[in-house]
């Protein structure tokens, strides 16, 4: 679902912008600190209700303002949506879809599936399992309508169980939580396993395109020993969990691991190879969504030229062009965009950013 218009008010150094966007490539060029990454961050905020750079909203609101406001128009065929989000220094958030209040962040996220590729995004590969669970759960959120409620209830029950571990004296007092928790854990883990297996060939094929010299393997680990009853594991681990103060085993420990030629990717790949692999994973997942749901996925790419040689940049540009997706790309100079062939398409847009101001 491409964005056709974007209005930004008081988001970091972007005080007042109104942009008409291309459904294809949108290039944002400017020096460091000009505001080009902030533009990507604003789009990301519209689709997630949070930033990919800071979790403190007061750092995102322009220093002279009391709030920021983001508004966008989404076009898909004959359908249009108007979406907006306002964040105040007090912490209050107002969401609107087609002028109506009472919406949730998940409603915005459903309308705007997007993948972000940033220099910090290597945590998907060399960070903890949390980042890889988020990768899987993003796909599941857009793939299965029932996933979000199961996932949210699972998080709620885990939080309640962890709090109860500090209060109960016997397992009998905790068992009511565990009966429901075990059911949800099995459901969520089965969804994750099925999705991971369906995505695996897409990942391997895309990795072969970008990194033909490597054999990339993927594997899903549900967070407890496969083939065992999670309810029994919870019961058997009660004393240990009570001593630690939290649930040590379960779907909250799941992981989606990547290996190159049989070894952990973070141990053997260069930073350039890791970035290519990260790009391949994001592209594979976005393209899988398009194939399964016939929905477009936005791609936000910050610092396109970083750590990629000209040949690899051209490969990435070619693959993105083929996807037919709406793409937002930042770069310091126009020269860095040569591999994106931006000057060859009349349907692309090029924006120059300087001190929070944009010119087209």
Swiss-Prot record:
- Read off the Gene3D superfamilies from this record: P-loop containing nucleotide triphosphate hydrolases, RecF/RecN/SMC, N-terminal domain
Location in or out of the cell = Cytoplasm
Q: What's one Pfam family the UniProt record gives for this protein?
A: SMC_N
The biological process GO terms on file are: DNA replication; DNA synthesis involved in DNA repair; double-strand break repair; SOS response
Record keywords: DNA damage included?
A: yes
Query: What would be one Gene Ontology cellular-component term for the protein?
Result: cytoplasm
Task: State what this protein does.
Answer: The RecF protein is involved in DNA metabolism; it is required for DNA replication and normal SOS inducibility. RecF binds preferentially to single-stranded, linear DNA. It also seems to bind ATP.
Identify the HAMAP family for this entry. RecF
Please give the name of this protein: DNA replication and repair protein RecF
Taxonomic source organism: Actinobacillus pleuropneumoniae serotype 3 (strain JL03)
What is the phylogenetic placement of the source species in the record? Bacteria, Pseudomonadati, Pseudomonadota, Gammaproteobacteria, Pasteurellales
